[in-house]
Structures are given as C-alpha cells and as structure tokens.
Amino acid sequence: MNILSAGKNYGWPLVSYGINYNGTRVSEHAWREGIEEPKIVWIPSIAVANISFYTADRFPKWKGNLFVGGMRTGEVAGTGHLERIVLNDRGEELRRESLLTMLHQRIRDVRQGPDGLLYVLTEEQAGALLRIEPAN
C-alpha cells in the first residue's frame, strides 16, 4: 500500500511483492531504483478487501489509524480479520493489531459511519453487518 503523490512511479507491474494465484511472483523484482517503496506490505497476503482511515472521535485512541478488511490470515483461506494499523505523522507504520479473528469470517468491507462508529461487512454463509462500538 502506498500514499500516492503526483509524479511518483509506483512500479506496477514492474515491481511487486505479490504472488499470482498459481504461486508465481507477479514480478521478479520487489524494488527498483526510481520506484517508490510501498508504505505497507503484507507477506503473506491478507487478501485486502477494503481500507478505511478512522477520523472520528468515538474511539479517540484509534483516530488517524488505518483499518483494513482482510480475507485471509496467513496461509489459511476463509480466515479473515480486521487489521488496525497505527501510523505516525509521516504515514509510516508503527504497529499492527488483528481484530475479529475469532469470527473466522472474511472481512469484505470496513467503513466509518456518520455516527463515528466502525461498520464491518463479513462474508461466508453466516455473513453479517457488524457495528463496532466503544466498550464503555
């Protein structure tokens, strides 16, 4: 994942950390001079479904965090999670936290609602729309 800036070269598909469905690499190069490095990489892929920045006040400690819907955890298909990524003021990753792993659901969508809460859409047969609220 990158934060895009005008005039920068992000390299797709000349460079990539990605793997095709058949197991081959998308590119033989993960990096080349003159091409911007990604800010965040998932190895192995979590099969990113959606990304949302949290800007509301309902979860003060989460303000400015990135929330990523993942459709897999590690190499196990059908075991997604919601990933919270804490960023510094320069958009650099400080740490990650896996949330909702106990659901064993692929996370299809995550969005901040107008009420400042997070809404998560899961997949699978028992798919649901979840509202994430503060504990207190």
Regions found by a protein language model. Give the residues of each.
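Beta-propeller domain segments
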Residues: M1-E97, Q105, G127, P134-A135
